[in-house]
């Protein structure tokens, strides 16, 4: 069931988290600029319902939720709900008539991928994390092409390593700047996601105070929604408010990365790829409750390259953070080398690579 018009069409399935949605948006924008018609498949309850229309793309919704870790009755009902969702996705495909379907993670990808296969439409999968999610793991057996961001992601499935699509502004930043080796205050960017990271919020005021006794340090700390007053108060209580910027959320990550010497953060796939692209050293604390502990394997990409330190949250304390920051503040040459080594593993043309695979399959069809 191919599109008989000259205009090529792609149905993109991605949702749930920014780690799925933002890379998919990068591909959507790239193909749209090449005169492709782009449509989205997602769920009405997750972030794609808001973000995708904001970026100018039409979105269709199906009814589907995750089943991992839920109760017995829900698991028993899951096959029937999946069947219903597959039929919903198939109706979207029959109406839109895409030349290719791209799955980039999230609940909608499962039913949408099955519907694509049943409809005879080429299915491309892209896995952002170093350990594949359950949906992509299952769909990889029926996909026309499997893509991944990191080496050795899939077992016994031939997958092409293409990197993670990221915003072109960050790629440009990495190409236009070098790691700052000037012996001035160590600039530490602390990012814990939109909700913040409690462990960072609890530790960093005291860590900053301790490091400031031996080295010059400034901090830009994203604390997450609802945490601004308490964390700012902790810095003020220690007399550190003059050298710290505290924000609930950082809207301009390009400016934040450009400012920073080192980043303290989680190890989401998109974060790891962005750090590599901009060439920033990092201290990575993987989210300990991530499914299959995939953030630890994401982090290893930068750690093994020598571009990051890994501090599992189970052993994280103030002394370890103080030690790492003091090392970096004392040895700016090593800081620069870490940034260079991080940049060595960057794949800056991931958007084009994903799009090119979709274009190739659409032309074959």
Swiss-Prot record:
Chief place of localization: membrane
InterPro entries to which the protein is assigned, alphabetical: GlcNAc_MurG, Glyco_trans_28_C, GlycoTrans_28_N
Pathway: Cell wall biogenesis; peptidoglycan biosynthesis
GO molecular function, one term: UDP-N-acetyl-D-glucosamine:N-acetylmuramoyl-L-alanyl-D-glutamyl-meso-2,6-diaminopimelyl-D-alanyl-D-alanine-diphosphoundecaprenol 4-beta-N-acetylglucosaminlytransferase activity
Annotated EC: 2.4.1.227
Domain of life of the native organism: Bacteria
Recorded catalytic activity of this chain's protein: di-trans,octa-cis-undecaprenyl diphospho-N-acetyl-alpha-D-muramoyl-L-alanyl-D-glutamyl-meso-2,6-diaminopimeloyl-D-alanyl-D-alanine + UDP-N-acetyl-alpha-D-glucosamine = di-trans,octa-cis-undecaprenyl diphospho-[N-acetyl-alpha-D-glucosaminyl-(1->4)]-N-acetyl-alpha-D-muramoyl-L-alanyl-D-glutamyl-meso-2,6-diaminopimeloyl-D-alanyl-D-alanine + UDP + H(+)
Keyword vocabulary terms for this entry: Cell cycle, Cell division, Cell inner membrane, Cell membrane, Cell shape, Cell wall biogenesis/degradation, Glycosyltransferase, Membrane, Peptidoglycan synthesis, Transferase
GO cellular component: plasma membrane
Residues binding UDP-N-acetyl-alpha-D-glucosamine, per UniProt: 17-19, 129, 167, 194, 250, 269-274, 295
Topology versus the membrane: Peripheral membrane protein
Pfam family, one: Glyco_transf_28
GO biological process: carbohydrate metabolic process; cell division; cell wall organization; lipid glycosylation; peptidoglycan biosynthetic process; regulation of cell shape
Subcellular location: Cell inner membrane
Function: Cell wall formation. Catalyzes the transfer of a GlcNAc subunit on undecaprenyl-pyrophosphoryl-MurNAc-pentapeptide (lipid intermediate I) to form undecaprenyl-pyrophosphoryl-MurNAc-(pentapeptide)GlcNAc (lipid intermediate II).
Family classification: Belongs to the glycosyltransferase 28 family. MurG subfamily.
Protein name: UDP-N-acetylglucosamine--N-acetylmuramyl-(pentapeptide) pyrophosphoryl-undecaprenol N-acetylglucosamine transferase
Native organism: Shewanella violacea (strain JCM 10179 / CIP 106290 / LMG 19151 / DSS12)
Taxonomic placement: Bacteria, Pseudomonadati, Pseudomonadota, Gammaproteobacteria, Alteromonadales
